[in-house]
């Protein structure tokens, strides 16, 4: 027995497009009819007359064939339009009877378990902070959590059934002063398959220097077997901003970790920290990226930027997530970049996040994640950020991650930056076969000492050592990084330039 799956709206759209194509071709044929079917002879001789008659005959034959094709095209469009209407009518006619059948199927499960077999969970009402309802036991998405009242948390998203996606968490309630509500957690994905729900955003707080923003809700975990984790919620804006929520973990067999939520913007105390990325599926899956740290804008005082979130760990076969960038400190220090996530067995480590620019001290770059135990390259360290002015201090670059034991190159160290130049990060160590990572360059000082270059990572068996990072210029210059030792079959890395 064969089955047909169709979408009436798509069929109707295709029929409309085909009708437009037919109209365009018909217009072109009509415009070409007169000049091509009445070709004049080039001269009065018999050959010219015969050639003109030949070309005119071909054009007349084409016009006759085009008329037949236009008729067929019109009939086809009519049939397609009628089919779309028939499918739509059949859907409308069957909706009410099937809904009654579904109610009969769900009634015993609702009576015994308070949950249907098939169907989506109800959404929480806005402003109540009510949790979203769970989806059907067999098939169904979880309902979204309701947003919180003023200063109250948002509701959690409902969990899915065997198949389905988790519901999103509700947003925390905003307040004019005081502490805002935190975001609700996202619901878990289906037991067999489904994505976790996103965490709700933290509430915003006013009230000048005393307001505290709500933290973003954590993302829901992916399905137990397959599914991506939900993203963490964004932290709320306030004088003391809320942190971003952590991303949910991926499914057991396969799934990508959810991204961490961004930290909220801080207006006086500090920017919120970025949420950590969720871990990838235990077997296959990449770790989620860390959330970006919130900026410190300091309308009323000083406020450093928030640190970036760490990247999630990869699965047995998967890469680590990148660390989040640190927040900018407009009147304060920049936030540190988050560290990259490490892989477990076979895969590359995640890159470290860049530090946030600061008006005083720049944020340090995050360390690169380590590669899988056997095979993979270490993640690159994040770049340190610029510190403001001649008295500022640049952030140090993050260290590169270590490679896998058997194969892989070490990660490169991050670059430092000035005021007083930040030091370059160390290059990561290589595996048995692979090159060491290069050290990061030191930052140039602005009326201050330059940053030292990072040392190159060493190789073990087959591979070259990483080059040392160049010294940053300044008063005085920084020291150059030393090259890493080469393997038994390899060269030593070059020292950095002074």
Curated annotation (Swiss-Prot):
Region described as Interacts with TLR2 = 140-260
Any known activators or inhibitors? Binding of Ca(2+) to PE_PGRS33 induces conformational changes and increases affinity for TLR2.
Q: Any keyword Signal?
A: no
InterPro entries, per database record: PE-PGRS_N, PGRS_rpt
Annotated region Essential for translocation to the cell surface: the residues are 1-30
Effect of a null allele: Deletion mutant is strongly impaired in its ability to enter macrophages. Deletion does not affect the intracellular growth in macrophages.
The record's section on Pfam families has: PE, PGRS
- What does the record say about its biotechnological applications? PE domain induces protective cellular immune response and PGRS domain induces humoral immune response during infection in mice, suggesting that this protein is a promising candidate for the development of M.tuberculosis vaccines. Immunization of mice with the PE_PGRS33 protein stimulated CD4(+) and CD8(+) T-cell proliferation as well as IFN-gamma secretion, supporting the potential use of PE_PGRS33 as a vaccine candidate for tuberculosis.
Describe what upregulates or represses it.
Answer: Constitutively expressed in vitro, suggesting that it could be an essential gene. Expression is regulated by SigA. Down-regulated during stationary phase, under nutrient starvation and oxygen depletion.
Predominant subcellular localization, coarse grouping: secreted
Annotated Gene Ontology cellular components are: cell outer membrane; cell surface; extracellular region; peptidoglycan-based cell wall
Report the domain of life of the source organism. Bacteria
Keywords of this entry: Calcium, Cell outer membrane, Cell wall, Membrane, Secreted, Virulence
Q: Where in the cell is it found?
A: Secreted, Cell wall; Cell surface; Cell outer membrane
What does the UniProt function comment say about this protein? Answer: Induces TNF-alpha release through human Toll-like receptor 2 (TLR2) signaling pathway, leading to macrophage apoptosis. The signaling pathway involves TLR2-dependent activation of the mitogen-activated protein kinase kinase kinase 5 (ASK1), which activates the p38 and JNK MAPKs, leading to enhanced expression of TNF-alpha and tumor necrosis factor receptor superfamily member 1A (TNFRI) genes. Signals are amplified through classical caspase 8-dependent mitochondrial release of cytochrome c, leading to the activation of caspases 9 and 3.
Q: How does it assemble?
A: Interacts with human TLR2.
Domain commentary? Contains an N-terminal PE domain, followed by a conserved linker region and a C-terminal PGRS domain. The PE domain is responsible for the export and localization to the cell wall. The PGRS domain is required for TNF-alpha secretion and is responsible for the main immunomodulatory properties of the protein. Variations within the PGRS domain alter the levels of TNF-alpha induction and are likely to have an impact on the innate immune response. PGRS domain is also required to mediate cell entry into macrophages.
Q: Which family does it belong to?
A: Belongs to the mycobacterial PE family. PGRS subfamily.
The protein, known as: PE-PGRS family protein PE_PGRS33
């Amino acid at each position: 027995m064969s089955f047909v799956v169709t979408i009436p709206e798509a069929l109707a759209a295709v029929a409309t497009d085909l009708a437009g194509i037919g109209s365009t071709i018909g217009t072109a044929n009509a415009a070409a009819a007169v000049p091509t079917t009445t070709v004049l002879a080039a001269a009065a001789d018999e050959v010219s007359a015969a050639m003109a008659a030949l070309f005119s005959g071909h054009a007349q034959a084409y016009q006759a064939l085009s008329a037949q094709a236009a008729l067929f095209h019109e009939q086809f469009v009519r049939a397609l339009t009628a089919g779309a209407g028939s499918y739509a009518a059949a859907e409308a006619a069957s909706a009410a009877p099937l809904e009654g059948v579904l109610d009969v199927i769900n009634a015993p499960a609702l009576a015994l378990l308070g949950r249907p077999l098939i169907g989506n969970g109800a959404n929480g009402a806005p402003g109540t902070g009510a949790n979203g309802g769970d989806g059907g036991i067999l098939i169904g998405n979880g309902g979204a959590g309701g947003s919180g009242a003023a200063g109250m948390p948002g509701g959690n998203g409902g969990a899915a059934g065997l198949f389905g996606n988790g519901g999103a968490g509700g947003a925390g309630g905003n307040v004019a002063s005081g502490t805002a509500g935190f975001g609700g957690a996202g619901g878990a994905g289906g037991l067999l398959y489904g994505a976790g729900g996103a965490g709700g955003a933290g509430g915003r707080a006013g009230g000048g220097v005393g307001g505290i923003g709500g933290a973003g809700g954590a993302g829901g975990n992916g399905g137990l077997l397959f599914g991506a984790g939900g993203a963490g919620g964004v932290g709320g804006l306030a004088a003391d901003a809320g942190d971003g929520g952590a991303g949910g973990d991926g499914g057991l067999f396969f799934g990508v970790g959810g991204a961490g939520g961004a930290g909220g913007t801080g207006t006086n105390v500090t920017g919120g920290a970025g949420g950590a990325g969720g871990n990838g599926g235990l077997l296959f899956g990449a770790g989620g990226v860390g959330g970006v740290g919130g900026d410190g804008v300091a309308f009323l005082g000083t406020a450093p930027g928030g640190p970036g979130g760490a990247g999630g760990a990869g699965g047995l076969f998967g890469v680590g997530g990148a660390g989040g960038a640190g927040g900018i400190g407009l009147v304060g220090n920049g936030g540190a970049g988050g560290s990259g996530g490490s892989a477990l067995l076979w895969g590359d480590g995640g890159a470290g996040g860049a530090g946030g620019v600061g008006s005083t001290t720049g944020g340090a770059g995050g360390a690169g994640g380590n590669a899988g135990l056997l095979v993979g390259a270490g993640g690159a360290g994040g770049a340190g950020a610029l510190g403001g002015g001649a008295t500022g201090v640049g952030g140090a670059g993050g260290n590169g991650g270590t490679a896998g034991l058997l194969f892989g190159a070490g990660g490169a160290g991050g670059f430092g930056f000035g005021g007083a130049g930040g030091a370059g990060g160390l290059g990561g160590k290589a595996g048995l076969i692979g090159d060491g990572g290069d050290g990061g360059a030191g930052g140039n000082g602005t009326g201050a000492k330059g940053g030292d270059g990072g040392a190159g990572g060493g190789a073990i068996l087959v591979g070259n050592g990483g080059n040392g990072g160049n010294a940053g210029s300044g008063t005085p210059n920084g020291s150059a990084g030393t090259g890493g030792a080469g393997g038994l079959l390899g060269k030593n890395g070059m020292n950095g330039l002074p």
